[in-house]
Swiss-Prot record:
Keywords for the protein's UniProt record, in alphabetical order: Acyltransferase, Taxol biosynthesis, Transferase
InterPro entries according to UniProt: CAT-like_dom_sf, Plant_acyltransferase
N-terminal signal peptide: none
Designated name of the protein: Taxadien-5-alpha-ol O-acetyltransferase
The keyword Nucleotide-binding appears for this protein: no
Gene3D superfamilies reported in the protein's UniProt record: Chloramphenicol acetyltransferase-like domain (3.30.559.10)
Residues of the active site: 164 (proton acceptor), 373 (proton acceptor)
Organism domain of life: Eukaryota
Length: 439
């Protein structure tokens, strides 16, 4: 689909503050919130909704209740209406000034069907969310953007952009579920938000106890990068999980299965020399790794980075089960050593991973974005908005739930060199055929 197929008209752009207004306060961010790869980044999502089948809802305007709900929920989440400031020691803090979150209302000249395959993120999606400048300081910028775009068919899209220093993906989903509750007329949140960033004050070690090779800078691939997706259905995933249980007497997650398959298929597709090593990075929610565990409602960053490594020859000659066990062990290692590994000095941290031997996985499939209901039912699809170049995203794999009209499973959204894309899909399909349940 060409970008010009979708035409969006901006109706209004305003700053929405908490209602009633709150006293100004200053809140400290945690050690993880202040990590270089977190404090200077944003993340975003599009939540796509079909028109309501209810006759009374066909002409209803979703922008009005969502805007009103935003003012109400900011009373519970004042940092999203504030601004970032840098302290004398270089850490960031949030001044809860009440300046507001950015809210945009827009109208498309098209029906929702113009977006085509909801699972296939495309350039037109960028019109559905106001893009904040990718500035590492984020001073004087809104920490939250909400854009509601209505379509002529009655469907709509809610685009959201969060500053990563204020929340992680789970925290963002928690906020959106609360926003939806307010939009539906609830007077009280089902889950009270908790700031308490002092609970995540980890020691910054003078010496690293582990070699953080996963952050070493590496050269980029110079080739056209394309974006597509691949779905692993739950029939295949469950069959593999059952096989692991029978052979090893261990449970494995859907993420571990999908990650192992992707790792092997990508390594084969890239034809990496057998003597080299390949690495995958993936985030883990560490809320339960603290002692005591972080409380329900905590919406700050609590993500640690796990790294699984293997020799190419061993990875490709071994079984899928072996790759799954390597990933499982890397998760156990991160959990055991979280407080010594999670925080390192900025000078020791380099997050440029543009190299064919290193890839990053992120799992959005269980965050609950698809369960956000503003009164029109759950989202039929959730998609990120590509605000960075495809070249910058070339080694990034995002795991999501497929759209409601697709088979249940895990959708892998990816950015790969054009010459490798076909080979990758062939390898994935071959593994699915090999491991599919015989019924």
């Amino acid at each position: 689909m060409e970008k010009t197929d979708l035409h969006v008209n901006l109706i209004e752009k305003v700053m929405v503050g908490p209602s009633p207004p709150l006293p100004k306060t200053t809140l400290q961010l945690s050690s993880i919130d202040n990590l270089p790869g977190v404090r200077g980044s944003i993340f975003n999502a599009l939540l796509i909704y079909n028109a309501s089948p209810s006759p009374t809802m066909i002409s209803a305007d979703p922008a009005k209740p969502i805007r009103e709900a935003l003012a109400k929920i900011l009373v519970y989440y004042p940092p999203f209406a504030g601004r970032l400031r840098e302290t004398e020691n270089g850490d960031l803090e949030v001044e809860c000034t009440g300046e507001g979150a950015m809210f945009l209302e827009a109208m498309a000249d098209n029906e929702l069907s113009v977006l085509g395959d909801f699972d296939d993120s495309n350039p037109s999606f960028q019109q559905l969310l106001f893009s904040l400048p990718l500035d590492t300081n984020f001073k004087d910028l809104s920490l939250l953007v909400v854009q509601v775009t209505r379509f002529t068919c009655g469907g709509f899209v809610v685009g959201v952009s969060f500053h990563h220093g204020v929340c992680d993906g789970r925290g963002a989903a928690q906020f959106l579920k609360g926003l939806a509750e307010m939009a539906r007329g609830e007077v009280k949140l089902s889950l009270e938000p908790i700031w308490n960033r002092e609970l995540v004050k980890l020691d910054d070690p003078k010496y690293l106890q582990f070699f953080h090779f996963e952050f070493l800078r590496a050269p980029s691939i110079v080739e056209k990068i394309v974006q597509t997706y691949f779905i692993i259905d739950f029939e295949t995933i469950n069959y593999i999980k059952q096989s692991v249980m029978e052979e090893c007497k261990e449970f494995c997650s859907s993420f571990e299965v999908a990650s192992a398959m992707t790792w092997i298929a990508r390594t084969r597709a890239f034809q990496i020399p057998e003597s080299e090593y390949v690495k995958i990075l993936f985030g883990m929610d560490m809320r339960n790794s603290f002692n005591p565990p972080l409380p329900s409602g905590y919406y700050g960053n609590s993500i640690g980075t796990a790294c699984a490594v293997d020799n190419v020859q061993d990875l490709l000659s071994g079984s899928l089960l072996r790759a799954i066990m390597i990933i499982k062990k890397s998760k156990v290692s991160l959990n055991d050593n979280f407080k010594s590994r999670a925080v390192v000095k900025p000078s020791e941290l380099d997050v440029n991973m543009n190299h064919e031997n290193v890839v990053a996985f992120a799992d959005w499939s269980r965050l609950g974005f698809d369960e956000v209901d503003f009164g029109w039912g759950n989202a039929v699809s959730v998609s990120p908005v590509q605000q960075q170049s495809a070249l910058a995203m070339q080694n990034y794999f995002l795991f999501l739930k497929p759209s409601k009209n697709k088979p249940d499973g895990i959708k892998i959204l990816m950015f790969l060199p054009l010459s490798k894309m076909k080979s990758f899909k062939i390898e994935m399909e071959a593994m699915m055929k090999k491991y599919v349940a015989k019924v």
